[in-house]
Amino acid sequence: MSGDAFAEFERAGWERAASHYEDCWTDTGLFVEALLDAAAVRAGSRLLDVACGPGFVSEAAAARGAVPVGVDLATAMVERARARCPDLTFVVGDALRLPFPDASFDAVTMNFGILHVSQPERALAEARRVLVPDGRLAFTTWMAQGNATDEISDAALAEHAIAVEGPEGPSYYVFAEPDECRHALAGCGFDLGSLRMDTVTALWRVPSADSLFQAQLHAGVRTAAVLRAQPPERLEAIRSAIADGVRRYADGDAFALPIAARLISAGPSGAGGDGREHR
């Protein structure tokens, strides 16, 4: 499937999922403050929140006194963000063709959006284009290890799902591997001397053993497409297996799922720095 087809698949999926996202995927919000710190967002910072979804990052940035603008490919996501944060600015736009002039933002963030674009390197290059010379990009991507959510879901799908042909898109863990990340950032105009790659872990608390399955089914895109293609008996087997996996993480009256992300940040080339990568 071409990049344009994958982009349309993602756009349509998020249009459908937008009304469920903020209730289902509270896990992404656990990384917002660290993301803003990595992007050096403070009072007065002009922030571009790429793949803004319902506006979690923009909302937190505004609480710091920053001036955020959120952009998302899905109109329904932008409408939801505007409803949640009526005093902030959100626009429909493509991370690969940002509708903003060169050097117009002090910081650019992308909270788990990089895995949802058809050309991740192009998204990095666009972020570089709209950054001021001393600005900073920060983005998150999932780690391949340390994520109970993926381990549980992947095991259930491997055992019970009928194979479904889907679009070819980036890995869920795109740029989490350090060498891949360095190569991409350098090629897109970022200074490796300013690069930081941190691993951030959290516990995602969900109220029921069924929460993860419901999130995957109603508020996801790629996995949701696989689930919707299953016959009823297969879908129920997957649901049951995921619920059993979640129950292993019981914590009082809820469930605490370990999750891990790579937090990556860098400034543009030519902005100064000591030439050494920071960790």
Task: List the predicted regions and their residue ranges.
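Conserved catalytic/acceptor-binding region of the Class I
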Residues: 121-122, 128, 133-208, 223, ...
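Class I SAM-dependent methyltransferase SAM/SAH-binding core
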Residues: 46-98, 107, 122
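A short SAM/SAH-binding and catalytic strip from SAM-dependent methyltransferases
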Residues: 106-120, 143
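Conserved class I S-adenosyl-L-methionine
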Residues: 1-45, 56-60, 77-80, 84, ...
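Conserved Class I S-adenosyl-L-methionine
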Residues: 3, 10, 27-29, 54-56, ...
